[in-house]
């Protein structure tokens, strides 16, 4: 094991100013000890390379207790780092292109679901969340806000990452726009069959989709062989509610 690793607390008493300073660097005090901290490593949008994985694991072995956890915002947290190892840990991570942070009254790390690759994803969540990360997390890194500000990007209305519970949430959607002229009133309507919430109905021989009941999940895309349901892709931004066509 590396000689720089310290596995036990020296019970070093730290001043509130010292604790606050390192918290601003992404280092949170372990409540069980006066001088042991957990260090948050930013992933950008939950994506890291295998080389970055190895660097984080090496840092955990070298400077912490050898354990790593994931935060709810998809950052990685190196556990059990003594106060005297904090600067060494941050420097080591920096050598591998990694940064620490994600604390305080600032823009917090951006959370993204796997909509880019998920069968239900309607937008490229990885690319969008990466842009948001660079623009707001990195770009506003030194901006102190009245309170922490959280952003999440969801690929569809399944809402896996709960965008609407963040300060700003983005939800990929597809809103169907039935074309009555193309609808042939099929007895076994494929649009009806594909809807998970049973919203589409044949009314007077034509397809009707209640806009208030439709959840915009996009499951009906391409299901009508006659093209009766073209769709408009949207990003839904909650709080405040807005729509932007993509």
Enumerate the language-model features and the residues they cover.
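N-terminal basic/disordered segments at the start of proteins
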Residues: 1-52
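Small-residue-enriched alpha-helical segments and adjacent helix-cap loops
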Residues: 13, 37-177, 181-186
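Short, flexible, solvent-exposed loop/turn segments with mixed acidic/basic and small polar residues
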Residues: 28-33, 64-70, 201
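Short beta-strand elements
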Residues: 29-30, 167-172, 242
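Short cysteine/histidine-rich metal-coordination sites, predominantly Zn2+-binding motifs
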Residues: 171-175, 209-213, 232-233
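Iron-sulfur cluster-binding cysteine motifs and their immediate structural context
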Residues: 188-207, 219-233
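Cysteine-rich micro-motifs
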Residues: 214, 218
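Single conserved hydrophobic/aromatic residue that forms the stacking wall/gate
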Residues: 235-246
């Amino acid at each position: 094991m590396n000689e720089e690793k310290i596995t036990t607390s020296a019970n070093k008493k730290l001043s509130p100013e010292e604790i606050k300073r390192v918290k601003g660097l992404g280092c949170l005090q372990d409540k069980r000890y006066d001088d042991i901290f957990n260090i948050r490593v930013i992933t950008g949008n939950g994506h890291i390379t295998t080389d970055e994985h190895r660097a984080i694991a090496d840092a955990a072995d070298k400077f912490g207790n050898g354990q790593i956890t994931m935060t709810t915002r998809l950052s990685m947290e190196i556990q059990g780092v003594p106060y005297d190892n904090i600067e060494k840990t941050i420097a080591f991570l920096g050598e591998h292109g990694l940064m620490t942070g994600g604390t305080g009254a600032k823009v917090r790390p951006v959370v993204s679901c796997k909509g880019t690759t998920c069968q239900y994803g309607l937008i490229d969540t990885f690319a969008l969340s990466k842009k948001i990360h660079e623009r707001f997390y990195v770009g506003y890194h030194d901006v102190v806000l009245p309170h922490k500000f959280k952003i999440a990007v969801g690929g569809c209305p399944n809402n896996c990452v709960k965008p609407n519970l963040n300060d700003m949430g983005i939800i990929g959607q597809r809103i169907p726009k039935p074309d009555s002229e193309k609808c042939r009133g099929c007895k076994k309507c494929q649009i009806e069959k594909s809807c998970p919430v049973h919203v589409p109905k044949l009314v007077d021989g034509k397809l009707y989709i209640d806009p208030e009941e439709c959840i915009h999940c996009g499951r009906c895309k391409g299901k009508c062989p006659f093209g009766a349901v073209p769709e408009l892709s949207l990003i839904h931004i909650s709080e405040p509610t807005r729509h932007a066509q993509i």
